[in-house]
Amino acid sequence: MADKSVKKVVLAYSGGLDTSIILKWLQTEYGAEVITFTADLGQGEEIEPARAKALAAGVKPENIFIEDVREEFVRDYVFPMFRANTVYEGQYLLGTSIARPLIAKKQIEIARKMGADAVSHGATGKGNDQVRFELGYYGLEPDITVIAPWREWDFKSREALLDFAEKHQIQITKDKRGEAPFSVDANLLHSSSEGKVLEDPAVEAPEFVHMRTIAPEDAPDAPTIITIDFEKGDPVAIDGVAMSPATLLTKLNELGRDNGVGRLDLVENRFVGMKSRGVYETPGGTILLAAHRGIESITLDRGAMHLKDELMPKYASLVYNGFWFSPEREMLQAAIDYSQDKVTGRVRVKLYKGNVTVIGRESPYSLYDQDLVTFEEGKVAYDHRDAGGFIKLNALRLRVLAKRDKRG
């Protein structure tokens, strides 16, 4: 039942099918004044058409907000996440998850500015995004009213949604096969495709699903070799050319795309309890992760590196589940950021037919001591004879256990 007390609602609006229907539904069911927010996250398509669609749906010009947030997205969300080498369930680089808190933050800021008493999103009632959006809303504005149409209206499937769209003359985009498109999410970090034939995890994804990369087998026969410069854990330059965060990630995406890097077909465990299959493309992020681990390998102490690796799965779960604004994520971030103080230097990377290989790394803060590790003779701080006592001390408890077991 619609809450008729809601007067103004800020809708996260893409201009696509779902949010176009939601816009009309909010106007008719709630009788509310709708304010739209459209974020340019680097999704690779023009977002200005969203303005025309909102106007055509009766939204006042002053209630239409379109903002280019690419630099903020990469600087304040993507890069902090990559300082942690964040990977969910060993594979997923969290391209969708990391965009939701920024959108939620912008909606709340607009709601405060415009005096809106509610916010709304287009996430379905089965997915993770509903959780991510709403935890973001409540984490920033605890008393805000949240309208989640997919949990309220009578549409139970995408087919019913298409019927509603046709009835109300809402434009339905088509892909080149003449069918309604896959469920797609895209931003500067990644693109994802779900639904239709992808719902069967036994069936290989058709090639036309991939939007961001060429097939690895079609990539050039010669490798591409680049350098990436880091300062305090963040990439700042490619091949010696300084770039802004969004520009740098865009360039890495282009390099990854041309070399077939960053494709991923996985089944993941959603926070809401079910498994889902998706096809992800994260070309620039895949390169960045490998390069960052490369520079950390010579600048981080073993203890700090191993502790970071232990903390990373928890950090990844917090991001995946929507707890970006939680104190525990901020605590972990503080520790991770502290670890990055000396993560500065240059990494050389080879891109070849879907593979990313670190082939060189250097840093003014390197902990790698060539004199110490060399097999050649020389004056070094390491005495081979010391290893005997080290081994015996570490073996002590194992020897005690073995003696007990021998006694029976």
UniProtKB/Swiss-Prot annotation:
CDD domains: ASS (cd01999). It is found in: Cytoplasm. L-aspartate binds at T124, N128, D129. ATP binds at A12, Y13, S14, G15, G16, L17, D18, T19, S20, A39, G122. InterPro entries: Arginosuc_syn_C, Arginosuc_syn_N, Arginosuc_synth, Arginosuc_synth_CS, Arginosuc_synth_type_1_subfam, AS_cat/multimer_dom_body, Rossmann-like_a/b/a_fold. One of its GO terms (molecular function) is ATP binding. L-citrulline binds at Y92, S97, N128, R132, S183, S192, E268, Y280. It catalyses: L-citrulline + L-aspartate + ATP = 2-(N(omega)-L-arginino)succinate + AMP + diphosphate + H(+). The keyword Repeat does not apply. Its EC number is 6.3.4.5. It is an enzyme of class 6 (ligase). Pathway: Amino-acid biosynthesis; L-arginine biosynthesis; L-arginine from L-ornithine and carbamoyl phosphate: step 2/3. GO terms for biological process: argininosuccinate metabolic process; L-arginine biosynthetic process; urea cycle. Keywords: Amino-acid biosynthesis, Arginine biosynthesis, ATP-binding, Cytoplasm, Ligase, Nucleotide-binding. It comes from the Bacteria. GO terms for cellular component: cytoplasm. Gene3D superfamilies: Argininosuccinate synthetase, chain A, domain 2, HUPs, Single helix bin. HAMAP family: Arg_succ_synth_type1. Homotetramer. Belongs to the argininosuccinate synthase family. Type 1 subfamily. This is Argininosuccinate synthase. It comes from Caulobacter vibrioides (strain NA1000 / CB15N) (Caulobacter crescentus).
